Regions:
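Eukaryotic helix-linker segments that join adjacent hydrophobic helices
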Residues: 6-76
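EF-hand and EF-hand-like helix-loop-helix modules
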Residues: 25, 39-43, 53-58, 69-74, ...
Length: 175
């Protein structure tokens, strides 16, 4: 403990972002039709600031050649300015790929996993440590069960309002 600066400091610039910048970033990700695993070059397409991309890449990818776009986008959505409702709306819209105002259970499960991993990674200062902690504690399985119990395994019509209620019931730390 105390042997160095946490890598989560690499994400500090995002705490200065306004909510509109986050929503614009999320929309750009969709408009560019980028993959879920981003190379450093693809991440530069999104963020444009090469110094920030290097920090983000170091935090999320470590020694890997790609980073999880969804984990990065969820982290940015959580760290940037805005109210709890604005954060929820940003997260929901990030996973509403068809732009119909609804997500399905599978998308909600992935979103929740990404959000929990983002929280843990920032707290632990390391994505790999967060992944290990999640595996050890069967977090992904618990999230899947929670979502499926609420919406059913084939839930297709989860609206923003349903999502907000779900977050308050299950994950009210966004409040």
């Amino acid at each position: 403990m105390g042997k160095g600066i946490s890598k989560s400091a690499h994400l500090a610039p995002f705490t200065e972002w306004e909510r509109k910048a986050v929503d614009d970033l999320l929309q750009k990700y969709k408009d560019e039709d980028l993959p879920f695993g981003l190379s450093e070059k693809q991440a530069t397409t999104l963020l444009t600031d090469e110094a920030l991309v290097k920090k983000v890449f170091e935090f999320f990818a470590g020694g890997d050649k790609t980073l999880s776009a969804l984990e990065m986008l969820c982290s940015v959505a959580l760290l940037a300015g805005g109210s709890a409702d604005e954060r929820k709306a940003s997260l929901f819209n990030a996973f509403d790929f068809n732009k119909v105002g609804k997500v399905c259970s599978a998308e909600l499960i992935i979103m929740c996993i990404c959000v929990v991993k983002a929280y843990m990674a920032v707290l632990l200062g390391d994505v790999k440590a967060a992944e290990e902690a999640m595996v050890t504690k069967d977090v992904e399985q618990a999230i899947e069960e929670t979502v499926n119990n609420k919406f059913g395994a084939d839930g297709e019509d989860i609206t923003l309002e349903s999502f907000k209620e779900f977050v308050v019931e299950e994950f009210d730390t966004l409040e």
